Swiss-Prot record:
Belongs to the adenylosuccinate synthetase family. IMP binds at D13, E14, G15, K16, N38, A39, G40, H41, T130, R144, Q224, T239, R303. Its cofactor is Mg(2+). Binds 1 Mg(2+) ion per subunit. Its main location: cytoplasm. GO terms for cellular component: cytoplasm. It catalyses: IMP + L-aspartate + GTP = N(6)-(1,2-dicarboxyethyl)-AMP + GDP + phosphate + 2 H(+). Substrate binds at V299, N300, T301, G302, R303, K304, R305. The active site is at D13, H41. It comes from Rhodopseudomonas palustris (strain BisB18). This is Adenylosuccinate synthetase.
């Protein structure tokens, strides 16, 4: 029996929500370990659509325990709004089935404002953030001035913490010629949040260790994708946290040895939101068609996603940086009907062939994809639930992807419905 980490193997939006929901049926606990409410995902269950951003996918299964780990940055108001929306849809959410790490960093209104100010200050310096305060909150965490959930349990300690926080933020506000934040107002807001949030507070590392020793199955749910990792992604066009699989340990307080299987999620093509390099991007009618078929718009922001062919170089790189054991390939059905399909198998950089994406921003912008053409298929793959339901050429495409990225396909998704999944290897039994 293995505890399983699920990570995006591209730039996010790979369909992690559906796969995590599908796997959560076999898990006892589902844990978020990084990011915030900037990465939304949609789940379709029995015809009902649910949109999640901050909450783990496990909340949709009442018998499971969901956990938000210390690696997450936590927006109190966004949390309460999301809980209310799901409760209105009939989803039961309470401290009985949801716990939040007591040492999680809080996102405050000042973080959201700073995020927006920076992003909108100049198009030349914009990196495409969601303006939800994620980056500034992580900055305060690393700068050792963040307000954490546990601080709400002892309100008397908050004033000096707020003063320390504002010593930094009000200096920035003055630089923007904006009025300073009022410490009293922030204290008032945090005081109001305390009774609503503290019932969920938990010493998460201890809770998970106890559950692990009891033999419970733990599913670690990543947000965004490995190519947005602050260290290993396309810097500076990345998120502000580590999104690779190793963060599952750091972001929950579990040791690395507790992770038994890493499942990477990737689309049968590639998408990206916002700025940054994208070697296989299609700016033609084919790219538009993939976007229309795949409904490639952000769950939270509604932003249109850039679309391109499958990039085996990038996914192979992610397989290495995340230690991925198996891949879940999603949205294969979007490629139905194309006469031919291109797959990137390498790059040319300044006249030389390379087998990875360089770390430098300048070099990243100069790489040119080397494509291999694969014959398409006319028969539909949508809603397939076994290999026998797939066209022969679609199976050849999947097998070629496996060869190029050096990793087996463990799951194949053919629609947003959780039942439309072909299982090759069960990650919990690997």
């Amino acid at each position: 029996m293995a505890n399983v980490v699920v990570v995006g193997a591209q730039w996010g939006d790979e369909g992690k929500g559906k796969i995590v929901d599908w796997l959560s049926e076999q898990a006892d606990i589902v844990v978020r370990f990084q990011g915030g409410h900037n990465a939304g995902h949609t789940l379709v269950i029995n015809g009902q659509t649910y949109k999640l951003a901050l909450l783990p996918s496990g909340v949709l299964r009442p018998s499971k325990l969901s956990v938000i780990g210390n690696g997450v940055v936590f927006d109190p108001q966004a949390f309460l709004d999301e809980v209310k929306k799901l409760q209105d849809q009939g989803v039961a959410i309470s401290p009985d089935n949801l716990r939040i790490a007591e040492n999680v960093t809080l996102i405050l209104p000042l973080h959201r404002e700073l995020d927006a100010l920076r992003e909108n200050a100049s198009k030349a310096t914009a990196i495409g953030t969601t303006q939800r305060g994620i980056g500034p909150a992580y900055e305060d965490k690393v700068g050792r001035r963040a307000i954490r959930l546990m601080d709400l349990a002892d309100l008397a300690t908050l004033p000096p913490k707020i003063d320390r926080l504002l010593a930094h933020h009000n200096a920035l506000r003055r630089g923007f010629s904006l009025p300073e934040f009022d410490a009293g107002k922030i204290l008032q807001e945090l005081t109001a949040f305390a009774p609503k949030l503290l019932p969920y507070a938990e010493t998460v590392w201890r809770l998970l260790d106890i559950k692990r020793r009891e033999g419970k199955r733990i599913l670690f749910e990543g947000a965004q994708g490995a190519l947005l990792d602050v260290d290993h992604g396309t810097y500076p066009y990345v998120t502000s946290s580590n999104t690779v699989a190793a963060q599952a340990a750091t972001g929950t307080g579990m040791g690395p040895s507790t992770v038994g299987y890493v499942l990477g999620i990737c689309k049968a093509y590639t998408t990206r939101v916002g700025q940054g390099p994208f070697p296989t991007e299609l700016t033609n009618e084919i790219g538009e068609e993939i976007g229309r078929r795949g409904k490639e718009f952000g769950v939270n922001t509604g932003r249109k996603r850039r679309c391109g062919w499958f990039d085996a170089v990038l996914v192979r790189q992610t397989v290495r940086t995340c230690g991925i054991h198996g891949l879940a390939l999603t949205k294969l059905d979007i490629l139905d009907g194309f006469d031919s399909i291109e797959v990137c198998v390498g790059y040319m950089l300044d006249g030389k062939e390379i087998d990875h994406l360089p770390a430098g921003e300048g070099a990243q912008s100069r790489v040119e994809p080397i494509y291999e053409t694969i014959e398409g298929w006319k028969e539909p793959t949508a809603n397939a639930r076994s290999w026998a339901d797939l066209p022969a050429q679609a199976i050849k495409y999947v097998r070629r992807v496996e060869e190029l990225v050096g990793c087996p396909i463990a799951l194949l998704s053919t629609s947003p419905e959780r039942e439309d999944t072909i299982l090759v290897q069960n990650p919990f039994e690997a």
